[in-house]
């Protein structure tokens, strides 16, 4: 005796009702041979739909066993059941359950997507099936543009897409007029003649009369099993499905998931835009703050270079703010001369500073007069805009030749007279301007201080009358480690003074400190901006949860036609990631726009974007989509298909 296509033994199905379990099916035994056309008839609540759901692998029995071609379904995993639905079954629903935003052809193609068939192959078959069912002119119509009979024919074509060896038709004419219902039953009879196993579920005895076999069920028990005519032998249909095409099938499913996600986002444009808003603001904030931090760092480091390239500063006292430093007079020009001959030194300059009133004609301003050596301008990396520098001979001769900076030139010569060659008064001492330096990026609070550079001998001897200097600046050779030089300078000066009555500052150390500080501040401010990203991510999660609720029936249909849990999970996860990626792209564009405007309004201070920051922004967008999209996607993947299909 041959094994029946379907064998049901002792199947019961119970559902919880309060504290009790209600048995809807009770010890059902049923065999269905391949090629049969059978009707399951019963009143509402008789258990016929529950039995159909179990036969279609949409539900599992509470007790008993269900076999398909000798395979026990109760031991199958969720994805194995999905494979059975995809490869063996075709569903025809009373309410059609077509996806409203897809065309007739696209609706028919859905089962083949999950079977791994190529796009061109499934499209050709969809058109072929629709043409066969008289819908050649309606393949591009969405369901709302089709009549009830036409929608049911699309549903039949979808059931046949992967072969439809077993067709489960739940009240297939229940929502149709008499003429359309007759057409549908004619199609089902033709499919039966071709070898398809047809299982009708109906309450209408007239519909049941189309079947060769009628099984009546009441209160969960089969009460009769009769044949209208002797079952004719029919050839089994050729299966149109095949195994998924490995990685190509997976790529194709992923491509379709991307397309479907894009279509879902486009279908709710305003909602999607509002959902993206939090991501846009968050990404724009993080990117802009990062660019602002990079610009600040560059500006500060550029300003530090005004202290000299790779320099060490020697000053009297124990450190900045030492109240006793003014009483220490051991730091003298001879210390600078001793440093000049050291192998690690590029150039050296003593510095001594005082503040005086500087006059030129009717103009009087407060300015800083800095006494320096001839190498000062090399040490500090200052460049001339006009004129020339004073030299070593000027230093020896206590020359009254001076160089002024761009700010002093601007304020002392508002009439735009060339300062070179002009005489100014430093307090009561006349001095001749021989050069003007270019504007520099000053470091510290004295951004716009007026400065006059004079030979240190002139400032010490003619203006202050003291032998000591305020500090000595040493420019280190580029091929020498500043850390080793700092120790060598300390030993040399300490040996000369007999005590450590001075302290050193290293421009390299200052640079490192500034870099660390600006990075820390940027990170701190960015962490505040990240809050916006988190809020945006929560918004994405909320909207995706709403989307899952709204599309519950769609999920049920996809599961019924063979979608795996991973297919549903990936579809909704991709949708969440796509929302975040588009939001991230718009956020970066917004940040770039802000940067362009900022740089236009502030030419001296630039926001600087790096490729790394943009990559990080996109990575953040993707991560947010994955993290906050996972819960809604998982909920969608775990939906009960029976419950999903039952929702309006």
Curated annotation (Swiss-Prot):
Q: Where in the cell is it found?
A: Cell inner membrane
Q: Which SMART domains match?
A: AAA (SM00382)
Alphabetically ordered keywords of this record: Antibiotic resistance, ATP-binding, Cell inner membrane, Cell membrane, Membrane, Nucleotide-binding, Plasmid, Translocase, Transmembrane, Transmembrane helix, Transport
Binding positions (ATP): 42-49
Query: What's the top EC group for this one?
Result: translocase
Give every ABC transporter domain span: 6-251
What protein family is recorded?
A: Belongs to the ABC transporter superfamily. Macrolide exporter (TC 3.A.1.122) family.
Q: Please identify the protein, giving its name as recorded.
A: Macrolide export ATP-binding/permease protein MacB
Q: What is the native source organism of this protein?
A: Agrobacterium fabrum (strain C58 / ATCC 33970)
Question: What are the leading ranks of the lineage?
Answer: Bacteria, Pseudomonadati, Pseudomonadota, Alphaproteobacteria, Hyphomicrobiales
